[in-house]
């Protein structure tokens, strides 16, 4: 994706030059042109065929999401071990087509002011730099999707995402239970065996299911019923008993509690402090992620020989997430724009992971956007979407798959914060 990342950046620069020249010719002065471009939302590369281009915005974005989801869910399953064409031919085809849909949506089907485009462009420039250093293809994918999510009907796009993900998952599960794709792949941990359901690792499958659950609940936001809370609870039970993905299961249970609260007493989420408390939760989880491991003391030669006892018990309950972060503090350097991480120590906490993989600048930007998105969603009354984002925050405490769009469709809710849009416009199609 290095070529696409560079191409999109160059195209955005070319659009800025083109629009400045056009505005200068229209207004007669550079100062007036800058003022118009800064405040007025306008299509890139001129407004030729704009009604038709605007009509393609949501379909292009939905197609990109569906292709991206199908690629990740099917081509990254154990089917890749059975057939070479899955990774050799199908995956690159789906991936490039998805990114081209996103690119066309960003460049040709969206209106921007230079104020919003400047903020988003700065984020993309930093993200591209981080991608080049970290080689994390999932990260650049989620960033491009967030940029492409501006002024689309998010529910319509999520329906395509959910349909593609559910269909691809059903195919993999059918192949798995038929004994065609990795029928006996299991993972042993502390004496227990965990089924991988055709994905090579239980947590990979757990993250995929969490993503589908969040997409489903986001789609049900305007018509939430007790059946939706029951679905969330059932998914949590399945994740706990099936692949034994505790983090994914606890996130589903937490989402169930939030949905139940929204159904029983929706006024709870309308209080004036709620948006600020929701935003503050990001700082709290981040502080716990970074500071709690500092209390560990190495007291033996084995990886799990840590004290004090109370903190060691918490670390054990989190399957060594704290001690792995403790080790990272001593093994890894912090690079300003990220780095390729070694396999050990494995950083499953998203806050620790992004500090080392993406660097402190990107980590601070992600945390700030997450907090701003939570504030905006609850401030504008989009309670269910805010609850989904809070559930992802819980998931991110013990898993780093929160940077995968397949696991984290709630990342698309950050788009409004990225472009500094009014919260009432988040997730809505652009007005004509």
Positions of predicted regions on the chain:
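Hydrophobic transmembrane alpha-helical segments in integral membrane proteins
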Residues: 1-12
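Alpha-helical transmembrane segments
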Residues: 14-26, 422
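Alpha-helical transmembrane segments of multi-pass membrane proteins
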Residues: 21-23, 66-79
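A juxtamembrane structural motif centered on a specific transmembrane helix
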Residues: 25, 34-50, 415-432
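Short, hydrophobic transmembrane alpha-helix segments
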Residues: 73-88, 107-108
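TM-adjacent membrane-interface loops and short helices in multi-pass inner/ER membrane proteins
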Residues: 313-347, 354, 358-364
């Amino acid at each position: 994706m290095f070529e696409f990342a560079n191409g999109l950046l160059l195209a955005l620069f070319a659009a800025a030059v083109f629009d400045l020249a056009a505005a200068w010719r229209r207004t007669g002065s550079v100062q007036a042109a800058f003022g118009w471009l800064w405040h007025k939302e306008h299509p890139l590369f001129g407004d030729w065929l704009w009604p038709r281009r605007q009509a393609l915005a949501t379909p292009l974005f939905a197609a990109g999401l569906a292709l991206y989801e199908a690629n990740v869910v099917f081509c990254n399953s154990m089917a890749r071990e059975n057939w070479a064409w899955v990774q050799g031919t199908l995956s690159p085809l789906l991936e490039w087509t998805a990114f081209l849909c996103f690119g066309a949506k960003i460049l040709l089907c969206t209106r921007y002011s230079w104020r919003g485009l400047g903020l988003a462009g700065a984020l993309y420039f930093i993200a591209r730099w981080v991608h080049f250093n970290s080689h994390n293809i999932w990260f650049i994918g989620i960033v491009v999707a967030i940029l492409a999510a501006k002024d689309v009907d998010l529910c319509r796009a999520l329906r395509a995402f959910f349909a593609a993900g559910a269909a691809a998952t059903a195919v993999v599960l059918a192949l798995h239970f038929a004994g065609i794709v990795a029928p006996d792949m299991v993972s042993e941990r502390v004496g227990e065996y965990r089924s991988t359901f055709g994905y090579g690792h239980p947590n990979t499958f757990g993250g995929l299911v969490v993503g589908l659950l969040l997409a489903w609940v986001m789609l049900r936001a305007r018509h939430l019923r007790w059946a939706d809370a029951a679905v969330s609870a059932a998914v949590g039970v399945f994740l706990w008993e099936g692949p034994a993905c505790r983090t994914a299961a606890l996130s589903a249970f937490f989402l169930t509690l939030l949905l139940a609260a929204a159904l029983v007493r929706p006024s709870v989420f309308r209080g004036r402090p709620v948006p600020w408390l929701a935003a503050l939760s990001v700082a709290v989880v981040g502080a716990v992620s970074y500071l709690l491991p500092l209390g560990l003391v190495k007291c033996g030669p084995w990886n799990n020989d840590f004290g004090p006892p109370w903190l060691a018990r918490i670390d054990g309950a989190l399957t060594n997430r704290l001690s792995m972060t403790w080790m990272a503090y001593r093994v890894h350097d912090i690079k300003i724009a990220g780095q390729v991480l070694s396999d050990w120590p494995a950083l499953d906490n998203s806050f620790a992971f992004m500090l080392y993989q993406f660097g402190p600048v990107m980590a601070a930007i992600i945390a700030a956007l997450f907090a701003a998105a939570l504030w905006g969603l609850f401030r504008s009354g989009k309670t269910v979407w805010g609850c989904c984002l809070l559930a992802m925050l819980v998931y991110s405490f013990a898993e780093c798959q929160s940077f995968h769009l397949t696991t984290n469709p709630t990342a698309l809710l950050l788009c409004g914060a990225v472009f500094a849009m009014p919260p009432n416009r988040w997730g809505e199609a652009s007005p004509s």
